[in-house]
């Protein structure tokens, strides 16, 4: 569902942000 999509997006966004900081 929508939560699954949100979790997938977060799984990619969080590491990407972590790389910059």
From Swiss-Prot:
The keyword Secreted applies. Expressed by the skin dorsal glands. The keyword Secreted applies. Keywords: Amidation, Amphibian defense peptide, Antibiotic, Antimicrobial, Secreted. The modification Phenylalanine amide is found at residue 21. It is found in: Secreted. It comes from the Eukaryota. GO terms for cellular component: extracellular region. Maculatin-1.1 shows significant antibacterial activity against Gram-positive bacteria, less against Gram-negative bacteria. Maculatin-1.1.1 is inactive. Coiled coil: none annotated. This is Maculatin-1.1. One of its GO terms (biological process) is defense response to bacterium.
